[in-house]
Curated annotation (Swiss-Prot):
Channel that opens in response to stretch forces in the membrane lipid bilayer. May participate in the regulation of osmotic pressure changes within the cell. The keyword Zinc-finger does not apply. This is Large-conductance mechanosensitive channel. It is a multi-pass membrane protein. The lineage of its organism: Bacteria, Bacillati, Actinomycetota, Actinomycetes, Mycobacteriales. It comes from Mycobacterium bovis (strain BCG / Pasteur 1173P2). It comes from the Bacteria. The gene is mscL. The keyword Ion transport applies. Belongs to the MscL family. GO terms for molecular function: mechanosensitive monoatomic ion channel activity.
Length: 151
């Protein structure tokens, strides 16, 4: 059981996750402070009556009590700023790199497989492997039909 846990830790995914959590927490704190110190005061002044503290985003319900929609709006702005940053700084580059890796990998294995097939065919026909391309890559004249036509 401990061996499996050690392998899980050694894979590196847990370290990446820990780094992401720490950076995400720090970034969330930064955006929260930005929203609290700059955005919230601006929102608080929207539609406020000069004689009272009631306005468009603060609804007076009597007895000096208000429903404060400014807090909700500030939290929504905070959420969208964090979501925007995470998507464009983490998710989008990650998906781009993952797709790029997936596209390159099948092409490389296909070339290796075709090179092995060509070399096996060349050995069967008595030719030296890679003699047509010179660099170990198949040329247009390489292949099973090219070797049988010359016989």
């Amino acid at each position: 059981m401990l061996k499996g846990f050690k392998e899980f830790l050694a894979r590196g995914n847990i370290v990446d996750l820990a780094v992401a959590v720490v950076i995400g927490t720090a970034f969330t704190a930064l955006v929260t402070k930005f929203t609290d110190s700059i955005i919230t005061p601006l929102i608080n002044r929207i539609g406020v009556n000069a004689q009272s503290d009631v306005g468009i985003l603060r609804i007076g319900i009597g007895g000096g009590q208000t429903i404060d929609l400014n807090v909700l709006l500030s939290a929504a702005i905070n959420f969208f700023l964090i979501a925007f940053a995470v998507y464009f700084l983490v998710v989008l580059p990650y998906n781009t790199l993952r797709k790029k890796g997936e596209v390159e990998q099948p092409g490389d294995t296909q070339v290796v497989l075709l090179t092995e097939i060509r070399d096996l065919l060349a050995q069967t026909n008595g030719d030296s492997p890679g003699r047509h391309g010179g660099r170990g890559t198949p040329s247009p004249t390489d292949g099973p039909l090219a070797s049988t036509e010359s016989q």
